[in-house]
Swiss-Prot record:
Recorded metabolic or biological pathway in which this protein acts: Amino-acid biosynthesis; L-lysine biosynthesis via DAP pathway; LL-2,6-diaminopimelate from (S)-tetrahydrodipicolinate (succinylase route): step 1/3
Biological processes annotated in GO: diaminopimelate biosynthetic process; lysine biosynthetic process via diaminopimelate
MF terms (GO), sorted A to Z: 2,3,4,5-tetrahydropyridine-2,6-dicarboxylate N-succinyltransferase activity
Assembly and binders: Homotrimer.
Pfam families (UniProt xref): Hexapep_2 (PF14602), THDPS_N_2 (PF14805)
Protein name, as recorded: 2,3,4,5-tetrahydropyridine-2,6-dicarboxylate N-succinyltransferase
HAMAP family named in the record: DapD (MF_00811)
Length: 279
C-alpha cells in the first residue's frame, strides 16, 4: 500500500527545487514518488480534493505532483487509431484489454481522450470528450460529447455533463481550488463552470450558463447574491441584472427555484426546465 504521507513529503520538497528538475536530472526517489502519486490519482485511492466534515479540502501536494510530472517526462509519440500524437502525458486506457475495461465497469466511446492520472468510476460513460490529468469522475456519470473535464476537477456521483460542457481545470496558482460538481447534478449543454466554483448537490444548471468566481448568482426568491457557489438544489438559468444607474444590464446566473431530490427524481430535468421557462 502506498504511504501517501511519505509521498507528500517527497513531493513537497521536490517542488521547492522544481527549477532544477528535468528528465535528465530527476532522482529515482522523486521520479518514483511522482509516478506513485499519479498512480494513486489514476486508481482513485487519492484525489486532489475531498469532502471532510462537510467542507472541501484540497490536497495541494497532489497538484504539485501533477506539475512535477511535466518536468520529469519528455514528449513522446503516442499512437492513436486515426492519428499520431506527441505529448508528455500518456493516455489512461493505452493498452487496455476487454477484461480490464469490464473490471473497471466503464464505457469509453471512440474519440474520447482520457489522460493518465485521472480517475473514472464505475458505470461512467465517456463519450467523445476530454478528461484531463488529476480529474476525478465518480460513479454513474455521463460525460457527453465534446464535454471537457479540466485538470483536477472533481465530479460527484450520478452527474450528467451534457454536450459541450466545460468544467474548468486548475493547476496554478496553487492556492486556487479545483472546480467541483457535487453528487446528482445536471449541467446543461454548452455551460461553463470554471475558476474553482462549487456546484452543490442536486443543482440543475440550464443550457448556456457561464459561472466563474466573479459571476453573480442571483436568487430571485430571496434576493441574495452568491459568488463561487451554487447552493444545493438550485435550478439555474442564464439571465441579466440591471445596473445601479439603470442604463445597462450585465450577465448573471439566476436561481429561479429550489428542488429537493424527491422532486427532481419525480419530475425530471426537461420538465423542470420547461416549467421554469414558462413562469
Amino acid at each position: 500500500m502506498t504511504d501517501l504521507k511519505h509521498l507528500a513529503s517527497v513531493i513537497e520538497q521536490a517542488f521547492e527545487e522544481r527549477a532544477s528538475i528535468s528528465p535528465a536530472t530527476v532522482s529515482s526517489e522523486i521520479k518514483n514518488a511522482v509516478l506513485d502519486a499519479l498512480a494513486a490519482l489514476n486508481n482513485g485511492s487519492a484525489r486532489v480534493a475531498e469532502k471532510v466534515d462537510g467542507s472541501w479540502h484540497v490536497n495541494q501536494w497532489l497538484k504539485k505532483a501533477v506539475l512535477l510530472s511535466f518536468r520529469i517526462w519528455d514528449n513522446q509519440v503516442i499512437d492513436g487509431a486515426e492519428s499520431t500524437f506527441f505529448d508528455k502525458v500518456p493516455m489512461k486506457y493505452e493498452g487496455y484489454t476487454q477484461a480490464m475495461f469490464e473490471a473497471d465497469g466503464v464505457r469509453v466511446v471512440p474519440g474520447a481522450s482520457v489522460r493518465t492520472g485521472s480517475f473514472i468510476g464505475k458505470n461512467v460513460v465517456v463519450m467523445p470528450s476530454f478528461v484531463n490529468i488529476g480529474a476525478f469522475v465518480d460513479e454513474g456519470c455521463m460525460v457527453d460529447a465534446w464535454a471537457t473535464v479540466g485538470s483536477c476537477a472533481q465530479i460527484g456521483k450520478n452527474v450528467h455533463l451534457s454536450g459541450g460542457v466545460g468544467i474548468g481545470g486548475v493547476l496554478e496558482p496553487l492556492q486556487a481550488g479545483p472546480t467541483i460538481i457535487e453528487d446528482n447534478c445536471f449541467i446543461g449543454a454548452r455551460s461553463e463552470i470554471v475558476e474553482g466554483v462549487i456546484v452543490e448537490e442536486g443543482a440543475v444548471i440550464s443550457m448556456g450558463v457561464y459561472i466563474g468566481q466573479s459571476t453573480r448568482i442571483f436568487d430571485r426568491e430571496t434576493g441574495e447574491v452568491h459568488y463561487g457557489r451554487v447552493p444545493a438544489g438550485s435550478v439555474v438559468v442564464p439571465g441579466n441584472l440591471p445596473s445601479a444607474c439603470g442604463t445597462y444590464s450585465l450577465y448573471a446566473a439566476i436561481i429561479v427555484k429550489k428542488v429537493d431530490a424527491k422532486t427532481l427524481a419525480k419530475v425530471g430535468i426537461n420538465e423542470l426546465l420547461r416549467a421554469v421557462s414558462e413562469e
